[in-house]
């Protein structure tokens, strides 16, 4: 996707916020526990390469990604020796590509190891489905058979074992405790404990320090976003959001009563009013469901009116403004703010989706 550097719409990523979130998390971790920065999905919309650089500078000991391509992008960007784990499925035919690039892969079923011919050592993390229901082995017997298969092949290394909690971002912990018990039972069935045992995502690492094990996977909270609104008031430290989204008015005009705007003419002025056109649309991740949501203009709320277009959006202004006036879609302005949580609540989704939706057509500028 082409990045729109010649359009007045941009994202600002606060390096200091990411560093502070990492440092605050590290301060509560035992010295032996590594923090791995989760930078999948273009670092949750924050930009994978630059975010990885910031995280490394802040003390992250490795990275987690969703797909092999993301891991290879990190290697190509200069992260030559850092630990990188692919959390999602890797095709068997790509096992040697991962091995040659010293990228750790997730194995979650026995047959993936069948007839695997390796040209370099492959580091494997065994995924346990303790209750998430996506990927993973589910019994002690499976774990033992996989451990035996790996032990026989001198090119395979059982480097880690892990699971993922379905309800770590909830205050009620009974299901979490069931998952933990199941994982520990499977872990205890192994003859040799792998180098890395890891279970904690952002929510678990913030609320359940007893399960830090050897490493944590620090994702959404590295970016200053709360894993869920339910636990927002139970966090051990304040999270600092790193992402802000801005644009500028490219056209300002006064509507007369009866004038309509955008596709379908779904919005019609009932009195004289000022509106502005913004150069951002659903192709940038400002999806059509944002219609009716508000942005900030010099600290004042301005609603999005009519249907959001692929490349443009129209807002109703509290009064006349000049073309070129800055508009805050996510971020702070004149003492007021619009957050990813605000957007998520309006859209009926989660803050993860709000930032992940922001496409690479919007340039990222890194500040502080």
Swiss-Prot record:
The modification N6-(pyridoxal phosphate)lysine is found at residue 40. The active site is at 40 (proton acceptor), 263 (proton acceptor). Its EC number is 5.1.1.1. It is an enzyme of class 5 (isomerase). It comes from the Bacteria. Gene3D superfamilies: Alanine racemase, Lyase, Ornithine Decarboxylase, Chain A, domain 1. GO terms for molecular function: alanine racemase activity; pyridoxal phosphate binding. Pathway: Amino-acid biosynthesis; D-alanine biosynthesis; D-alanine from L-alanine: step 1/1. InterPro entries: Ala_racemase, Ala_racemase/Decarboxylase_C, Ala_racemase_C, Ala_racemase_N, Ala_racemase_pyridoxalP-BS, PLP-binding_barrel. The keyword Ion transport does not apply. Substrate binds at residues 134, 310. SUPFAM superfamilies: Alanine racemase C-terminal domain-like (SSF50621), PLP-binding barrel (SSF51419). It catalyses: L-alanine = D-alanine. GO terms for biological process: D-alanine biosynthetic process; peptidoglycan biosynthetic process. Belongs to the alanine racemase family. Catalyzes the interconversion of L-alanine and D-alanine. May also act on other amino acids. NCBIfam families: alr. HAMAP family: Ala_racemase. This is Alanine racemase. It comes from Listeria innocua serovar 6a (strain ATCC BAA-680 / CLIP 11262).
